[in-house]
Swiss-Prot record:
Protein's name in the database: Uncharacterized protein L381
Origin species: Acanthamoeba polyphaga mimivirus (APMV)
Basic and acidic residues compositional bias, start-end: 11-31
Residue ranges with Basic residues bias: 1-10
InterPro entries: PLD-like_dom (IPR025202)
Amino acid sequence: MSSSIKKLKKDTKDTDKTPSKKIYQETHNSEDSEDSEDSDNENNTITMFNSTQNFYKYINLNKIKSSNYHSEISDNSIRPYFENLEKHLVEYINKATYVIGCIAWLTNDNIISSLQQKKGIKIIVNKEEFLNPNMEIAKKNYYCTLRSKYQSLPNMFTSKCYCCSDSITSCKKFNKIFGSISMSENNNSSVLTCGIVNSLPKMHHKFLIFFDENLNPVGVWTGSYNLSKTSNFSLENALYITSQIVIAEYIKEFLAVYKHSENFNWKSGTLYGKLKNPVY
């Protein structure tokens, strides 16, 4: 254990659980650890976490850049983003009618609020303990509220279609895009989950696909950016792509993950569905 970490532990003990005023560097327990109950600090430069009486302070790494030094890209089919990613993503969500995608974590309140205004969504997240209400961690107020927000999101696959005023799954255009969607009581929620609980192999995708009211795919958002509050403090990147060829490939990937997805309040911590050639 390094001397700096030893000193930190002494500081926290001597101050009777009062956080040390020093900012220190230490790897968090999980590389992609997301928002917790204590993560709603609106300070733009520092967010504080309390974990097993060790106090973590995260500085906003975006502050290392004094200005946006990136050039405007003239290629209209792809746009890179490095700053204000939440703002740009919310703008794309607001313009869309339907949104689908695979996102490792969905905990950003502003993004969830934007998704609530859509005609319909279908988003797959990584399978986590807090999604199952029977797990101990899931009983925390923060996670109870988060699951309640998931339940309030509009389900694309059970909505009515704009173009034919019928069930969207009866729409010819929908079926041309998504093929024969298999729906059951196991995958009928707006937010689904895929993966294995407490396992390092994760459903680690980060992409959203946007559709207009006529079910025309208009763009895909992808990159390193997690849809979480803490990601706004990290150095992240994202691409917005309007190439129909590229969008079609992301739809294929969504459907592949969908086949092994279930409602977010999962019943089994193992992977849903059977693999033809499982590798261990």
